[in-house]
Amino acid sequence: MGTIFASCTVNRTPMDRQPHQWLCERSSEDVECQRALLALERLPRHVAIIMDGNGRWATARNLPRIAGHREGIESVRDIVKASAELGIGYLTLYAFSTENWKRPEAEVSALMRLLEYYLRAELDELDRNNVRINAIGKLVALPKRVQRILTRAIERTAGNTGLVLTLALSYSGRWDIVRAVQMIALDVRRGKLSPEDISDELFGSYLSTAGMPEPDLLIRTSGELRVSNFLLWEIAYAELYSTATLWPDFRRQEYYHALADYARRERRFGMTSEQVSASSNSVPYRTYIKELFDTIVQRRKG
């Protein structure tokens, strides 16, 4: 098995991030799983996640909903670390939607405190591990104390070149699209643009995600089959992965399964299957490595 891994190379463009050795101990089994994933040669550049199920996780244990949100932070920590270790360039987490403001005031306040706690507690480690923090959404709606620590985190990590961790806060896809339309209309009225200038590329440059590649993989936990107003423009060609696992239970092993599932899919972008196959001769090899990865995971469970 070691010989197989040694013979594998990962093809990356200069803009792709390189795998990062997070500054902590990892098990040999985890390292082996990551090697198998890297050997697939087809990891997503940008992963977006709808983190769902915190409340149900807590209810199933007769705990207050905030307990589920606290445990969900542990999943965030683990998935961020795993993403950086695998060299994934962008991870976008749907942390708080515009619709979430409708929740009970006590829960919203607790969520804001947890967000502030996470940023304060994790900032040093994220910075040491070359993670760049970003945020999208109607950030002025957040409490001032959260805005301050968020601004500090963004500014402090602005020069980092590793994983770009984007937190979607007070965010909705429709809000972002309407905002982009308003700004384009204003620029047309000011004479900076003409209607003929408007294209997919130009429209994307007015979104809060401008400068980021579109998500390759959208993961949703808790088994729900909807996108919940998340990155509506950007996920046009994203591969979707839904799991019944609730977010507090979603850790790196299931994340690895989602990534392996993505790697074996055929992304067509409007082309036929024959056209895609003609442009890539590595599908049988990826299938073989996927089977090898599944064997490793099953051995761990045993």
Regions found by a protein language model. Give the residues of each.
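Flexible, compositionally biased loop and terminal segments
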Residues: G2-G302
